[in-house]
Every structure is written in C-alpha cells, then in structure tokens.
A protein has these predicted regions:
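Donor-binding and catalytic core of enzymes assembling or modifying cell-surface/extracellular glycoconjugates
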Residues: 176-272
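Leloir-type glycosyltransferase catalytic cores
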Residues: 114-152, 282-375
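Conserved nucleotide-diphosphate donor binding/catalytic pocket of glycan-assembly enzymes
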Residues: 54-141, 147, 156-165, 169, ...
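N-terminal pre-catalytic "stem/leader" segment of glycosyltransferase-like enzymes
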Residues: 1-55
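Gly/Pro- and small hydrophobic-enriched strand-loop and loop-to-helix capping segments
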Residues: 260-292
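Active-site donor-nucleotide binding/catalytic segment of nucleotide-sugar enzymes
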Residues: 6-9, 89-104, 148-214, 272-274, ...
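Structural recognition of alpha->loop->beta junctions
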Residues: 48-67, 214-228
C-alpha cells in the first residue's frame, strides 16, 4: 500500500471550495497513483462530490462553525483518523486576514495541529513538496443520472445550462429583466431549437448555499425559449444535466467550477468581487465588464459600489445597462463554445490578456498559478 494523504480543506461551504479540494486531491494522487488520498471538508459543503472522484479514498465531513468561535473543536475532529503520512492544508489557514475574518477557521486549524500526527510531513495542498501533478480531471457522473439527463434534453438543438445567480446577496447578480435580454439574444442566434435548463437551489434550510433570488428567476420559464427548470433536483442530477449541455452560463459562482469538472465550457458574466481563477483544461469565456461598468469589480472583500437598477440597487457590473451593452459579446461567446470552435489555450491566453487591463497583474492569482505563464 502506498502513502496515505489527507487533503484538509475546512473552509466556507459554497460548492466551489469543495471542487478546489477535489482538484488538489487529484493532483496529489496523480503524482503517485499508489497513494490513498482522502479529503476533509466542511460538513455544510456537498461532500458527496467526492463520490464522483474515483481517486478519493474517503471524504470526512467536519461539522464546525466558520464565522463563530467553537468551544469543542477537538471533539469535532475526533472521527477523522489521527495518523497520516501527509496532511495537506488549505493555504488560506495560513493567511492572517482569513483567520481574523473567520474565527472558526482559526480554532479548527489549532485543533487540527494538535490532532494530526504526520509520519512524513505536513504541507499546503498543491505544493510539490508532497508530490503534485497538475492535470485536468472530470467528475464520473453515474450512468443512470447521465442517461436520464440525455433523455430529458432530447432535442436536437444547442443546449445551455443557465444558473442566473450564485449564493451571495441578490444585488451581486443580474436581474430577471437582464436575463430576458440575454435569452432574447441567444434565441435570435440559435433559433427555436435552443434548449435552456435552469440550474439552482431555492432554499438554504438544509444549511447549504442556495441561489439568490431563486423565486424571481422562475419567471424566466415564461420566456419564448421556454427553459425547463432543474431547480432543487439532487445535486448529481443537476450536474448530469450540466454535463449534457454544450455550455454553462452564469455570473461568477463556485458552481462554475463544478461545471468545468463536468467538462462543460463555462460562459461567465464576469464582474463583482472575484475574477475567474480555475479552468481545468476546458474552453471558457469570461465576459469582463468594460469602462464604467467595471467600477468596483474584482476588489475581493472591499464593498462594491451599487447603482440604481429598476426597483433595486445592484453592483455596477451587474446592472441591466451593463448586460444590455454586453449581449452581443455574450452571444458571440456562446456560439464559440456551443460550436466547439474555441480551444482552451486560446481561451485562457485571451482571458489573461484582457484581465490584466482590469486588474494589476501582481494582484492576480489562480489555482495552480496557471496565470503565471500568460502574464
């Protein structure tokens, strides 16, 4: 039996952070496939995604607060085996500002330092000290779910999965009226055979993230495209539908990382706090905001400026004026991705050439530092 590694990624619970951990697990397994690689995740994140990754031996869910302090951190780790050859931490736990922002992360980290015993060593996930082979990977969607998705999307036209919002406040995402403009453009470009499926989750009562403003976005089903709704279906079923589509369309959201793990090209209405930083060897397009519409974007945790947008205030990069101006760019990008005319290398080179005009190059970061080769 080879070495036993634990990728310890206790962090915020949006789905994208689980995908990050599984990506690192794949890289550490890929450097020596005789290894047994397990992952530790926040219990509120979709831990079941590890079951779609045959290189993951086991996933450990840890029920521990992130935003608040915790009086019994050691007890919450007791079900995780203590002894490993390697424990590989999420690098965020070594960032002082993260520990200030998330007191629970500080206490989890201290408890894990006390609990884990490493035969060889401890490092940061993605670092080569413990062996790491960066390579694209894909979720292994169960055949039954994949076949059901194919049966559901049984038309002959282009297929686009649409997630209209992520899990932050509704002011960070386009309005229903803006999405109607996008669907108008897509319908004109692709014709009546276009199939659109709505992806999302309407409630966070189970402790997991939900799609902001989910109820309002259900009115998109009244658009002439007649999107079908996959809202609130089990996560694996929704991922199977995404995998069966030609493109995944959304604002910046961690679910986009899951789409890339399905091998589905991601078309992002970029803007807001974060740029796109994970790519997984899949063609993509990020429609970066231009000019005044970019005001306040990509400032991480700094407050975003809001602008009047109909009957609400919205991030400047997500207003109807911005979306209307960018519909032609969105449609062209959708055509590239649906038609398969865009290579990954061209996509990433053009993305970073444009991003560096919006963000100081020294401030840009990405998973596995893939940006370095393009700046």
């Amino acid at each position: 039996m080879g070495e036993r590694l634990l990728v310890s990624h206790f962090y915020a619970h949006p789905v994208g952070h689980a995908v990050e951990a599984l990506h690192y697990a794949h890289g550490h397994w890929g450097s020596d496939t005789s290894r047994e690689v397990s992952v530790l995740l926040n219990a509120r994140t979709p831990v079941e995604l590890a079951g779609l990754c045959p290189w993951v031996t086991r996933a450990y869910a840890v029920d521990h607060p992130l935003l608040e302090r915790c009086a019994d951190s050691p007890a919450r780790l007791a079900h995780v085996p203590r002894e490993w050859d390697w424990v590989l931490d999420d690098g965020r736990r070594y960032q002082d500002w993260q520990l200030e922002l998330f007191p629970g992360l500080r206490e989890f980290s201290a408890a894990s330092d006390e609990w884990f015993a490493c035969r060889i060593g401890r490092s940061v996930s993605g670092q080569h000290r413990a062996g790491y082979a960066q390579a694209p990977w894909r979720f292994q969607i169960p055949r039954q779910a994949a076949d059901a998705a194919t049966d559901t999307l049984n038309g002959t036209g282009p297929r686009i999965a649409l997630m209209p919002a992520g899990s932050s406040g509704p002011e960070h995402y386009p309005s229903t009226a803006s999405w109607h403009l996008v669907l108008d453009g897509l319908l004109e470009a692709f014709g009546p055979d276009l199939q659109v499926v709505l992806i999302g989750k309407s409630s966070d009562e189970d402790g997991r993230t939900a799609t902001a403003g989910a109820g309002r976005y259900m009115t998109l089903r009244d658009h002439p495209v007649t999107p079908m709704s996959a809202y609130d279906r089990p996560l694996v079923e929704q991922l199977a539908l995404v995998e069966a589509c030609d493109a995944f369309l959304s604002p910046h959201t961690g679910f986009g990382l899951a789409a890339l793990a399905c091998g589905t090209p991601w078309l992002t209405l970029s803007g807001g706090r974060w740029w796109e930083y994970f790519f997984n060897g899949v063609p993509f397009r990020s429609i970066l905001p231009d000019g005044a519409h970019a005001s306040g974007s990509f400032a991480a945790l700094e407050p975003e400026p809001l602008a009047a947008d109909g009957d609400a205030e919205r991030s400047v990069s997500m207003t109807q004026a911005r979306i209307r101006a960018d519909v032609p760019r969105i449609v062209r990008a959708a055509q590239e991705l649906v038609n398969g005319t865009l290579s990954y290398e061209r996509a990433i080179a053009e993305y970073y050439a444009e991003l560096r005009t919006r963000v100081e190059p020294a401030a840009i970061w990405s998973i596995d530092n893939v940006h370095v080769a393009y700046l």
